């Protein structure tokens, strides 16, 4: 499962472990019951009749277990209970490892989530590809328009127009080209890669692998899918959410509920 993101990036699922079922199994270790099943089944107490014969009386009464509903709700009820009441450890029994290609400035925000494990491509050892993030004019304009509700996007009270946005992007592209020339020149001159990389902008694309349990992926999404999160990391969070929805659909439904 792979999603192409921004102009040169992607997020790809490498592996996942566990499932909605394994969350239930982990929670039920304390009672040794295990996974009982999803969906509705005939009530085991009244065998689906809705009535519970009371030995000391001659009349039947409503089943005390299913309350006359004939069926019992499956383990989705327990899953919902665990999620609602923040029983966190069962959700730590499942998780995912993903590979991400994103601008370095996105990774700097991403790495604030210290409960994930990371390993990133290093410009100390290999040259980074000459790929830099170039936002669209629409992105610049939309960011300026949200400055009143998102203080990180504030534009110092200045109104951005379309021509100014285009001019700035042209200057940005020239800056990227100059930075790459300085970077390559340094390598050709014999400057160590770990120092030549000083010329690389934070818009340069890098790659990493990130791994976390399901609980911590959901915590990541709570922050990075929020409306006030920066757009560039939000698109990656949305892709992670689609991976979770595919691998853990019942938990995902609870998270979005």
Ranges and model annotations:
Residues 54-60:
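Short linker/helix segments within small regulatory modules
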Residues 1-47, 52, 66-257:
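Family-specific signature for flavin-dependent thymidylate synthase
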């Amino acid at each position: 499962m792979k999603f192409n993101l921004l102009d040169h990036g992607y997020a790809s699922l490498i592996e996942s472990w566990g499932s909605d079922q394994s969350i239930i199994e982990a929670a039920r270790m304390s009672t040794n019951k295990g996974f009982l099943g999803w969906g509705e089944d005939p009530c085991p107490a009244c065998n689906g009749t809705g009535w519970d014969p009371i030995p000391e009386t001659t009349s039947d009464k409503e089943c005390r277990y299913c309350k006359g509903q004939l069926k019992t709700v499956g383990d989705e009820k327990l899953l919902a209970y665990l999620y609602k009441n923040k029983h966190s450890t069962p959700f730590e029994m499942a998780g995912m490892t993903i590979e991400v290609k994103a601008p370095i400035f996105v990774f700097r925000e991403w790495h604030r989530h210290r409960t994930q494990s990371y390993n990133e491509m290093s410009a100390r050892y290999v040259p980074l590809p000459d790929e830099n993030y170039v936002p669209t004019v629409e992105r610049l304009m939309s960011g300026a328009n949200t400055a009143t509700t998102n203080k990180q996007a504030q534009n110092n009270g200045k109104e951005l127009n379309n021509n100014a946005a285009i001019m700035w992007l042209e200057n940005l592209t020239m800056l990227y080209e100059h930075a790459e020339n300085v970077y390559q020149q340094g390598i050709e001159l014999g400057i160590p890669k770990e120092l030549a990389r000083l010329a690389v902008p934070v818009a340069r694309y890098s790659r990493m692998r990130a791994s976390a349990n399901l609980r911590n992926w959901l915590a990541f999404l709570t922050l990075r899918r929020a409306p006030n999160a920066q757009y560039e990391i939000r698109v990656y969070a949305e892709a992670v959410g689609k991976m979770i929805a595919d691998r853990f659909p019942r938990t995902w439904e609870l998270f979005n509920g």
